[in-house]
């Protein structure tokens, strides 16, 4: 992971040790919902932590959007569909794209009025979203076309491909606040490592690709003059167990490290290396040191400049008592606007 190590040395990366939550759930679907919603493991929450933030900052969305204050998408998911992360109380606050060029498909024309029925209300909503998509496609195309040169990204690296799109749109002038990308393959129940050399194998290859992609992204942002606007964060719904199983893999675990990156990150290591018991079994987990909701809350307060009382209100009942303010963002990075004015420059990926 030489790329991430280089950023760490440059003061642009942070490792948070053993991030998790109490009473972890080991189902892929349920654990993903917990991480995206910011809920406790015994709570069913149908909105996302970023969606609730965007719903606070841009009330009544999608009605009245885009507008002069916020002409751009609020959140963008690079992929085929939006996720729970950007789900607000009544609508998903984001949109998904695969590529700025192929996405652009401007359609114009008039439509018949919707009937005054429940089905008509649904049709009106669908038309509103469709119209927004057409309008947003125009600004996305313009932002993409505003960038004529980018830095080099690693070949055959899907994460790098996604981050390259994000860098292009940020540099091109989109005011979008949150971008989401994804990179899979880490569910290594078997063949996580090569039996002859456990420093190599599937897991090592995946981490190298993550490292290379993040380094290329950060370098690209720097050469385009926008690195101070962007903070990045990694997460997964699981850690892995302490001890490998009989298939040279590891099963679903509890706590895991998170990486943060950007020029405004308070770089370094947060937390201590976990103590590994000599007699650990395949069922043992790394103990949690930090609650993942504290990471979210700190970014909302210190990067998106929200008052702590507002931050607390954006989490499900009972969560605010668990939240810590963590040393993740450099002092002065927040522009101290509370509540934040629409279109502030801070971007989270």
PLM features per residue range, with description:
Residues 1-212, 216-224, 243, 257-334:
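Feature for exported/extracytoplasmic and membrane-associated proteins, marking the mature portion
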Residues 337-348:
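Pro/Thr/Ser/Gly-rich low-complexity, intrinsically disordered linker/stalk tracts
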Residues 254:
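Glycine-rich and small/hydrophobic secondary-structure elements
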Residues 220-228, 232-251, 259:
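Hydrophobic alpha-helical bundle architecture
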């Amino acid at each position: 992971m030489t790329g991430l190590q280089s950023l760490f040395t440059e003061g642009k990366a942070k490792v948070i040790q053993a991030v998790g939550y109490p009473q972890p759930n080991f189902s892929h679907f349920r654990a993903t919902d917990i991480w995206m919603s910011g809920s406790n493991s015994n709570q069913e929450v149908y909105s996302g932590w970023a969606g609730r933030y965007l719903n606070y900052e841009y009330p009544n969305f999608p009605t009245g959007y885009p507008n002069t204050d916020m002409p751009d998408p609020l959140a963008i998911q690079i992929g085929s569909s939006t996720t729970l992360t950007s789900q607000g109380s009544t609508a998903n606050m984001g949109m998904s794209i695969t590529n700025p060029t192929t996405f652009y498909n401007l359609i114009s024309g008039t439509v018949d009025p919707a009937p005054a029925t429940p089905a008509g209300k649904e049709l009106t909503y669908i038309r509103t979203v469709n119209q927004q998509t057409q309008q947003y496609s125009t600004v996305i195309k313009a932002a993409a076309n505003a960038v004529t040169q980018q830095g080099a990204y690693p070949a055959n690296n899907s994460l790098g491909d996604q981050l390259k799109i994000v860098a292009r749109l940020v540099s091109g002038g989109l005011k979008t606040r949150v971008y989401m990308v994804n990179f899979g393959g880490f569910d290594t129940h078997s063949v996580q490592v090569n039996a002859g050399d456990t420093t190599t194998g599937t897991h090592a290859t995946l981490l190298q690709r993550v490292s290379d992609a993040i380094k290329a992204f950060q370098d690209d942002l720097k050469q385009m003059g926008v690195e101070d606007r962007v903070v990045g964060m990694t997460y997964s719904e699981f850690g892995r167990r302490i001890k490998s199983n009989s298939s040279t893999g590891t099963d679903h675990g509890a706590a895991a490290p998170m990486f943060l990156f950007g020029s405004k990150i308070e770089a370094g290591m947060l937390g201590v290396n976990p103590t590994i018991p000599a007699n650990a079994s395949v069922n043992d987990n790394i103990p949690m040191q930090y609650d993942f909701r504290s990471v979210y809350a700190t970014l909302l307060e210190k990067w998106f400049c929200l008052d702590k009382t507002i931050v607390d209100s954006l989490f499900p009942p009972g969560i605010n008592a668990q939240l810590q303010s963590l040393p993740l963002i450099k002092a002065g990075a927040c522009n101290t606007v509370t509540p934040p004015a629409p279109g502030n420059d801070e971007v989270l990926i």
